[in-house]
Amino acid sequence: MRHLITTKDFNKVEIMELFKEASDFLDEKPRTFLKGKSITTIFFENSTRTLSSFESAARRLGARVLRLDVSRSSSSKGETLYDTAANLDAMSPNAIVVRHANSGVPLILAKHIHCPVVNGGDGKHAHPTQALLDLFTIYNHFQGDVEGKKICIVGDIKNSRVAASNIELLSRFNLDITLVAPPHFMPNTHLKKHYKLDENIIANSDIIMSLRTQTERHNKTVYASLKDYANDFCIQKSLVKDKKLILLHPGPVNRNIDISDEMMSDERTLVLKQVKNGVAIRMAVLKKLILENEG
């Protein structure tokens, strides 16, 4: 049984096949590949973009979607994760998409469910479809010429599952990664590190990936206010100037904290393209896992 728990679950050949399929899906036309199939979404953490993206992807493939309301589910009343898995399995879905605040939950569910499980984000651990859509966006922009491209990841890297998945995936495709964050947001890593964002770093980057500060994952207050953080790490036109690059963000964007209003409206900022690409990538992932499982 194939699952997508981390980006490591797909090899490079499979990822390139996903990109080819996703490129076809960018026309937004409805398909019938998953007609008669059922996909269950169960998000134990709040989500608007990822949940909507997966559900749009499923419906465009012709599948039915069952969204489980966790706030009213038995899990909120003390049901164990194993019982939740057993009950989900008893509904005989063709795939389950799960998000959870605790790292490792999608993997635990995958061991007790007889259909593909897709990780929609677990704790600080992984967010594989976000990393895939980010690389897909980069790949399309540079027309496949991504090896050696310099990417600067800025923000709360230590607490970001998006950063964790991107670092694994982008390293495999030989992008040159630099991390920029305050010391308390910086993970232990062999990658190049800077503790302040400046013009020289941006001048040497082809891609900037800004991240949201994960205040809900902080055990203590790090900054008196997010404005203090923004003074050092907000992506602003005065820093970027006319540099030829692209700016990415997984969303939601804290305007004037992560990225300035001016840069959000800049044509180099591809946040909305990431959203569009996300639906196409998730279509490709769901189609691959479900049809391979039944083949």
From Swiss-Prot:
Q: Which reaction does it catalyse?
A: carbamoyl phosphate + L-aspartate = N-carbamoyl-L-aspartate + phosphate + H(+)
Q: Which InterPro entries match?
A: Asp/Orn_carbamoyltranf_P-bd (IPR006132), Asp/Orn_carbamoylTrfase (IPR006130), Asp/Orn_carbamoylTrfase_sf (IPR036901), Asp_carbamoyltransf (IPR002082), Asp_carbamoyltransf_Asp/Orn-bd (IPR006131)
According to the UniProt record, what class of enzyme is this?
Answer: transferase
One matching Pfam family is OTCace_N
Query: Where on this chain does carbamoyl phosphate bind?
Result: R49, T50, R99, H127, Q130, G251, P252
Query: In UniProt terms, what function does this protein have?
Result: Catalyzes the condensation of carbamoyl phosphate and aspartate to form carbamoyl aspartate and inorganic phosphate, the committed step in the de novo pyrimidine nucleotide biosynthesis pathway.
HAMAP family xrefs: Asp_carb_tr
The EC number on file is 2.1.3.2
Organism of derivation: Campylobacter jejuni subsp. jejuni serotype O:6 (strain 81116 / NCTC 11828)
Q: Which GO terms label this protein's molecular function in UniProt?
A: amino acid binding; aspartate carbamoyltransferase activity
Gene3D superfamilies, per database record: Aspartate/ornithine carbamoyltransferase (3.40.50.1370)
Q: In which pathway does it act?
A: Pyrimidine metabolism; UMP biosynthesis via de novo pathway; (S)-dihydroorotate from bicarbonate: step 2/3
Where L-aspartate binds, per the record, is at K77, R161, R212
Q: Which family does it belong to?
A: Belongs to the aspartate/ornithine carbamoyltransferase superfamily. ATCase family.
> What does UniProt give as GO cellular component?
cytosol
- What processes does the entry annotate via GO biological process terms? 'de novo' pyrimidine nucleobase biosynthetic process; 'de novo' UMP biosynthetic process; amino acid metabolic process
Q: Which cysteines are joined by disulfide bonds?
A: none
Q: Where are the transmembrane segments?
A: none
Annotated protein name in UniProt: Aspartate carbamoyltransferase catalytic subunit
> Assembly state and interactors?
Heterododecamer (2C3:3R2) of six catalytic PyrB chains organized as two trimers (C3), and six regulatory PyrI chains organized as three dimers (R2).
Q: Which UniProt keywords apply?
A: Pyrimidine biosynthesis, Transferase
